[in-house]
Curated annotation (Swiss-Prot):
It comes from Caenorhabditis briggsae. Keywords: ATP-binding, Cytoplasm, Developmental protein, Kinase, Nucleotide-binding, Nucleus, Phosphoprotein, Serine/threonine-protein kinase, Transferase. Its EC number is 2.7.11.1. GO terms for cellular component: Cajal body; chromatin; cytoplasm; nuclear envelope; nucleus. This is Serine/threonine-protein kinase VRK1. InterPro entries: CK1_Ser-Thr_kinase (IPR050235), Kinase-like_dom_sf (IPR011009), Prot_kinase_dom (IPR000719), Ser/Thr_kinase_AS (IPR008271). The lineage of its organism: Eukaryota, Metazoa, Ecdysozoa, Nematoda, Chromadorea. Autophosphorylates in vitro. Belongs to the protein kinase superfamily. CK1 Ser/Thr protein kinase family. VRK subfamily.
Length: 559
């Protein structure tokens, strides 16, 4: 009886959708909350996630526990991509940065009676593939070589750890910062292979493993991933990034034909490469040719001299940058028919339409801004007072030229006397501004009463003789026009100002202390003000009761 045939291997299944907000407990007693799904990789789903109680977002890959790709990746992370391992490597090599992610957490959880495997790694800004598509399907030579240098550094770490990546492509390269190509990080280790047991023995079952248009000729033959294969894969990617196409791109559905096209291309170097990169400096094509030469001359099980390759890539990037600065307009537009994904040719710099619209709005709005200028209000023939009107006020417009304002004080006095009274009023307001309690501003009516006493022939207490005014100095109404200084309040009227506080109240310390305005003064100052004010008004009342004489000080201090 013939032996039974082995049961066919179960194909990988796509992971079921996991609801947002699901909490997963880690073996380290940390809780992670599943976020929204933003991508699908292989047979798994890729979600954002956060640690419970924290806001920093991370990436969680979820697959059924029976699937192999995520298991392979978890094994690689646990063996060589833990955070402390990467830090020790950087210290040993004396480097500050390396383009590889580190493992945060991994494990199992049950969802709808199905066992699921998960892995958590850091979250990055964007993928190189998204940037390439946004740029019309290609990148500049300088940016492409900058990314290649980062990838070579990551591959050097993997090769030193006896692992080959086997799936280098733009979709598996992430940027830590948008448009910062020097921060490229190599991810997705689902096809990574440990090379310690590699033997140059092709197996048809493994033929064409990887991404068909980029995979190495070793993989097309059926060999396991190798160190030289990673360099060859990166060289194919550089051609795709710079030119936007590959000669075998339309043959992707037929892996055997792709393999034949690659063999012809590599056999015809450097001429076949120069025919594609016609508009690039010679060092750029020379750098990629060197990568193909190294991959062909290196033995299947031997490691590649990454330091030599990185030096060549750096020199080519510098020459590409210099050539772009010298001739920025000489690069013709590329043929977009070779790459189906490319829709339109765009500028190298990635800029969203929203940012362009905002810049246009700012340019349109700026000329419309009105500059508020100061206006001058004429207060006198000789002096002008500049008044700066704030934007928020809506005051009436004042003419720059016109008749000076004047107040009719209703008194007959000479020009010199009226100027003297005006100066007294000005001095009173200045002293009032210094919070001197013994000074009270006078009104125009008080000044008028004082002038009427100055006109008498009887000498007052001030023993000053004042000449009477002549009728020639008066206007048609018998009044004198006095131009008020800026310190005189425009609300001054002819009538006597009434404060609402009687002289009897001011003369009584007890009553004066009860006045609300007096309470605003500090205690020590309040007592001094009450004492001075009551003493002055008591003396004034006593003088009025005994002999009605003229007191010059009362003219300037009585309210």
């Amino acid at each position: 009886m013939p032996p039974k045939k082995a049961a066919p291997k179960k194909l990988h299944e796509l992971a079921p959708e996991v609801r947002v907000g699901l909490k997963i407990d880690d073996i380290s007693k940390k809780t992670y909350i599943v976020g929204k799904q933003f991508a699908t990789g292989g047979f798994g789903r890729i979600h954002t996630c956060t640690e419970d109680g924290k806001s920093q977002q991370m990436v969680m890959k979820i697959e059924p526990s029976t699937n192999g790709p995520l298991l392979t990746e978890v094994v690689v992370f646990n063996r060589i991509l833990k955070k402390d391992m990467i830090e020790n490597y950087k210290k040993a090599k004396k480097i500050q940065w390396i383009g590889l992610p580190h493992l945060i957490a991994n494990g199992y959880f049950t969802y709808n009676n199905e066992k699921m495997r998960y892995m958590i790694i850091p979250k990055y800004a964007t993928s190189l593939e998204a940037v390439r598509e946004a740029n019309g399907g290609s990148l500049s030579a300088k940016d492409s070589l900058t990314v290649a240098d980062c990838v070579l550094g990551a591959l050097e770490y993997l090769h030193d750890s006896d692992y080959a990546h086997a799936d280098v492509k733009a979709a598996n390269i992430l940027l830590e910062k948008p448009n910062d190509f020097s921060s490229a990080v190599l991810v997705d280790f689902g096809l990574a292979h440990r090379t310690t047991n590699n033997v140059d023995k092709p197996d048809k079952k493994r033929a064409h493993n990887g991404t068909c248009i980029f995979t190495s000729t070793d993989a097309h033959r059926g060999n396991n991933p190798s160190f030289r294969g990673d360099v060859e894969i990166l060289a194919y990617n550089l051609i795709m990034w710079i030119s936007g196409s590959l000669p075998w791109l339309s043959l992707e559905a037929s892996p055997d034909k792709v393999f034949e096209a690659k063999q012809k291309f590599v056999g015809g170097l450097p001429g076949t490469l120069q025919s594609i990169l016609t508009n690039q400096p010679a060092p750029v094509a020379g750098c990629i040719t060197t990568m193909f030469d190294v991959s062909r001359k290196t033995d299947y099980t031997h490691k590649v001299d990454m330091a030599k390759l990185r030096k060549k890539v750096t020199e080519a990037a510098q020459s590409a940058s210099t050539g772009a600065q010298k001739k920025p307009k000489m690069t013709p537009s590329r043929d977009t028919t070779a790459t189906p994904k490319r829709k339109s040719q765009r500028a190298p710099r990635v800029e969203s339409e929203d940012e362009e619209e905002e810049e246009k709005k700012e340019v349109e709005i700026k000329p419309k801004k009105k500059v508020q200028r100061s206006r001058k209000v004429v207060e006198d023939d000789d002096e002008e007072e500049e008044v700066i009107i704030p934007k928020s006020t809506r005051s009436r417009k004042t003419k720059e030229e016109g008749t000076p304002r004047s107040f009719n004080l209703g008194m007959t006095s000479s020009t010199a006397t009226s100027d003297r009274v005006a100066k007294k009023i000005e001095m009173k307001y200045k002293r009032l501004a210094t919070n001197k309690p013994s000074l009270v501003p006078v009104t125009v009516a008080d000044a008028s009463s004082c002038e009427s006493q100055y006109e008498s022939n009887e000498p007052g207490p001030s023993s000053r003789v004042v000449k009477k005014r002549t009728s020639e100095e008066r206007d048609a109404n018998g009044e004198v026009q006095l131009k008020t200084p800026a310190l005189v309040s425009p609300d001054v009227k002819k009538t006597k100002y009434k404060s609402g506080i009687s002289s009897a109240t001011k003369a009584s310390p007890t009553e004066l202390r009860r006045v609300p305005g007096v309470r605003n003064f500090p205690k020590g100052r309040r007592s001094m003000i009450i004492k001075e004010t009551s003493a002055r008004y008591q003396e004034k009342r006593a003088t009025r009761n005994t002999k009605p004489t003229f007191d010059d000080s009362s003219c300037s201090s009585e309210v």
